[in-house]
């Protein structure tokens, strides 16, 4: 079977100091046609002002345009405050200035969301993300505040029908149910809520209506094949490629989604399912 349809990586980062355009070239040469480029902050010095967030986002948008112009790939862009950047700023500023530091961190988070919304309204960005909560143990205060701000962001997204890409903790029995409850409480359409770095059990009974974006390492294939027919709305595939010169190929390399797509087809997953993954679902979630 020769599949010549679209192939989309739903969560990939690019870095001007990394492979950048060469990574996009590798993706295309393997058969990739579309990318969802997710903003990645400079964790060593994340923005501290609204203007700083806008400038950082503008650079991600510029990289997306370079990829479009150079290779003709479809590129959708996701902008927002990475939970790790928020948590590290929060902890540093609270240590420096107590309650004032807390307020400053919350204000900066809101500025980052406002800046992302600006580019969504301008038609340059397609979703907000990756937003959510830390994937490592933190103090209860940090966890509770992260959830509070996540729900605030869900509320804003619900008002305008904007998709969210979520960065959350590793799998636990309550992860999907908790996210679903919070989103529904804020009026979100769960079909606009994407769980980045999702495990490969994509049954709707497991995902509670969220859209899973499966990190498609080799170990994910068997479970994905077992469960994909029970994914009511479908699923995405992603690499979470970091384009980090210090960690080449992490998390998965840019050639991975095209390779996994063909492996899934060879294993008996239908072309219709892959067409939904790579074309119909992205159009429904992000728009054309």
Label every PLM stretch briefly.
Residues 6, 155, 258-288:
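Mid-to-C-terminal alpha-helical segments outside catalytic/metal-binding sites
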Residues 167, 231-252:
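Short acidic/histidine-rich active-site segments
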Residues 16, 106-200:
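Divalent metal-binding pocket/active-site signature
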Residues 2, 44-46, 50, 54-120:
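Metal-cofactor-binding active-site regions of metalloenzymes
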Residues 6-15, 22-55, 69-85, 126-127, ...:
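Divalent metal-dependent hydrolysis catalytic cores, especially in the metallo-beta-lactamase
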Residues 2, 24-31, 61-76, 113-125, ...:
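Acidic (Asp/Glu)-rich catalytic clusters
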Residues 11-15, 40-42, 80-86, 133, ...:
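Active-site beta-loop-alpha junctions enriched in small/polar residues
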Residues 31, 37-51, 87-102, 124, ...:
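Active-site gating loops and adjacent loop-to-helix segments of metal-dependent hydrolytic enzymes
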């Amino acid at each position: 079977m020769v599949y010549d349809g679209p192939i989309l990586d739903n969560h990939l980062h690019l870095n001007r100091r990394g492979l950048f355009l060469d990574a996009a070239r590798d993706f295309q040469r393997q058969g990739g046609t579309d990318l969802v480029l997710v903003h990645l902050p400079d964790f060593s010095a994340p923005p501290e002002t609204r203007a700083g967030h806008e400038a950082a986002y503008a650079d991600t948008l510029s990289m997306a345009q370079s990829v479009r112009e150079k290779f003709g790939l479809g590129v959708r862009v996701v902008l927002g405050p990475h939970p790790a950047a928020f948590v590290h700023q929060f902890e540093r500023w609270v240590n420096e200035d107590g309650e004032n530091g807390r307020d400053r961190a919350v204000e900066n988070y809101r500025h980052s969301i406002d800046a992302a919304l600006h580019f969504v309204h301008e038609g340059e960005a397609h979703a907000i993300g990756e937003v959510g909560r830390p994937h490592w143990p933190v103090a209860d205060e940090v966890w509770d505040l992260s959830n509070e701000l996540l729900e605030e962001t869900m509320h804003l997204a619900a008002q305008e029908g904007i998709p969210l890409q979520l960065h959350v903790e590793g799998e636990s029995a309550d992860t999907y149910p908790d996210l679903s409850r919070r989103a529904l409480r804020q009026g979100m359409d769960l079909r606009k809520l994407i769980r980045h770095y999702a495990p490969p059990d994509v049954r709707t009974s497991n995902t509670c209506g969220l859209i899973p974006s499966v990190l498609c390492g080799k170990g994910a294939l068997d479970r994905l094949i077992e469960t994909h027919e029970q994914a009511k709305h479908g699923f995405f595939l992603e690499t979470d490629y970091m384009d980090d010169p210090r960690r080449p190929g992490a998390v998965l390399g840019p050639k991975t989604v095209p390779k996994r797509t063909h492996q899934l087809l060879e294993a008996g997953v239908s072309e219709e399912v892959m067409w939904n993954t790579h074309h119909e679902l992205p159009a429904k979630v992000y728009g054309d």
